[in-house]
Amino acid sequence: MPLSSDVYLTTSLDGGFSSAAHFQLQASGTYLADFHPRAFALIDLETYHSAYMGKRHLKEELEAQIPDSHPFLYKGDVFLFLHREGDGDIFSELAEEFQLKILISAPIDDLFTLPQLYRTAREALELMRDARFHGEAVCSAQQLRTPLLLKNLEGRSDLIPPELRRLAVHDREKGTQYCETLYHYLTCCHSLIKTGDALYTHRNTVLYRIRRLQDDFLIPLEEPSLHADLLLGVSLILFESKGPDFFLRTPKNEA
């Protein structure tokens, strides 16, 4: 007896196919044989509720608003496919109405790559469940790449240079913003104006802080080969002190 398409999908998500050819052979005869979705979405159901008496269930709502999405339950979350560029726009209203958190995956090149894409998407959705997360109810995996990386490195104080650990202690005890200044200075390509804009402060204040970073805290800003270490270290500090929200990227700012 042929297996259903959902069984092939769950087997694929579980990494049960040894090759793309094996997957294609097994899925032949189902809609998956000629199926080319743009992406998929994961919907967290922890706080799901139906707000009104007689309201259609979430599954019916998804099928009505996103045709051919084939929603099904996988490991406690709703998994569904997206085909059109505007499909993701529908989620904001649904997230508000049904109290959902929704993660949109990176683009799908081949259905055989679903296990890798799913792993990242599931970790990103877990990040959205974090009590420190106060971002939008609908996010893309691309938006969460940086905080997700830092989440996976959380607690690795051994990756933070000693001079940055001392800087973090100074910020914490004195209420200063040297770690934030260093982060924005590095990510803004050493532009005083852009760093000032990011911090909502004057460029002269930024210049003063940069000089103190070099002279008083011995941060090696004149050594380009150390900039990657500095950026990673200060990012880990800020992730611990400010949480994932500090690193959220909004779609309108993406190139």
State where each predicted segment sits.
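Cytosolic nucleotide-utilizing catalytic cores of signal-transduction proteins
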Residues: 7-255
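CheY-like receiver
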Residues: 1-4
